[in-house]
Regions:
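Acidic donor-binding segment of Leloir-type glycosyltransferases
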Residues: 14-53
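A short, conserved alpha-helix in the catalytic core of glycosyltransferases
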Residues: 89-90, 156-176, 181-210
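Short, well-formed alpha-helical segments that are part of the catalytic scaffolds
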Residues: 3-16
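C-terminal, non-catalytic tails of nucleotide-sugar-dependent glycosyltransferases
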Residues: 100-101, 110-111, 129-156, 166, ...
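Acidic metal-phosphate-binding loop of nucleotide-sugar-dependent transferases
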Residues: 32, 55, 79-81
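Short aromatic/hydrophobic "clamp" motif used to bind/position activated sugar donors
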Residues: 73
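Glycine-rich, basic loop-to-helix element that forms the pyrophosphate-binding segment
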Residues: 50-68
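Conserved donor NDP-sugar-binding/catalytic core segment of glycosyltransferases
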Residues: 81-132
Length: 251
């Protein structure tokens, strides 16, 4: 955590997103500057883990999950602002025992807050991942209109982003959480989903579980770069060929 204005908005979105679903907030801070001034104002009900150095997304996520006890775990980036009912929708999906992971339908911020190209403002940022003919994982329909029929048809997917991922704690424990082999982060969420799929569980995107994603806002503020190319090669060396060319199912 580091972009405290976004973290504040993220936290403020939780009550309406959860509705009558009880939840516990666990924040893992990777040695953010000026953090004490912010965290001193937090409610005492929030569990705070302060790392003495930037451990990266993977280890921070694992540490946060380990502190909790609930049967469901929601991994949520501090740069994601949830819409009302999003958490409740995801929790309800787990009434189906075949569901192992539930992802979200995330959109780019509107133009006045956009950090990227204006053409993507308010459009799809994430609605699941698939593989292309080369075995590379990519985000489905990124930059498309939210209400496009093909976007709305997405349901069962190969993987979802760890920016907003809910899973069963028993699966998380069996798998061992996110794999530290991916360093500070990138593709650990994909590998987690593939492990869940290998356990004969389904990965879905709930079209009604929505939110805004400012995509790596904190990492950009503090000049943290993710090893995209290296981790992509690592992912393909470990999983290449098992799920070839799944994108055709969504087009």
């Amino acid at each position: 955590m580091g972009k405290f204005d976004l973290l504040t908005r993220c936290l403020e979105s939780l009550p309406d997103a959860a509705g009558d679903i009880p939840y516990r907030v666990i924040i893992v801070d990777n040695d953010s500057p000026y953090r004490d001034e912010f965290y001193d104002k937090l409610e005492t009900t929030v569990t705070l883990i302060k790392n003495k150095e930037n451990m990266g997304f993977v280890l921070a996520s694992n540490a946060g999950a380990k502190r909790g006890k609930a049967p469901l775990i929601l991994m949520l980036n501090s740069d994601v602002i949830l819409d009302p009912g999003a958490i409740k929708r995801m929790v309800m999906d787990f009434d189906d025992p075949e569901i192992g992971v539930v992802g979200m339908k995330l959109r780019f911020p509107e133009l006045k807050e956009h950090l990227h190209a204006a053409k993507d403002a308010g459009k799809v940022q994430h609605v699941g991942l698939a593989t292309n003919i080369h075995g590379d994982f990519y985000h489905l329909f990124i930059g498309w209109d939210l209400d496009h029929p093909k976007v709305q048809a997405v349901d069962d997917v190969l993987a979802v982003t760890g920016a907003g991922l809910m899973t069963r704690r028993n699966l998380w424990v069996q798998i061992g959480g996110f794999n530290p082999i991916y360093g500070i982060g990138c593709y650990e969420d994909v590998e987690y989903c593939l492990n869940v799929k290998a356990m004969a569980k389904t990965i879905i995107v709930d079209q009604e579980a929505t939110g805004i994603h400012f995509t790596n806002a904190t990492a950009k503020e503090f000049n943290v770069g993710y090893p995209l190319k290296q981790n992509n090669m690592l992912m393909k060396s470990r999983w290449g060929g098992r799920y070839p060319w799944t994108c055709w199912q969504h087009h």
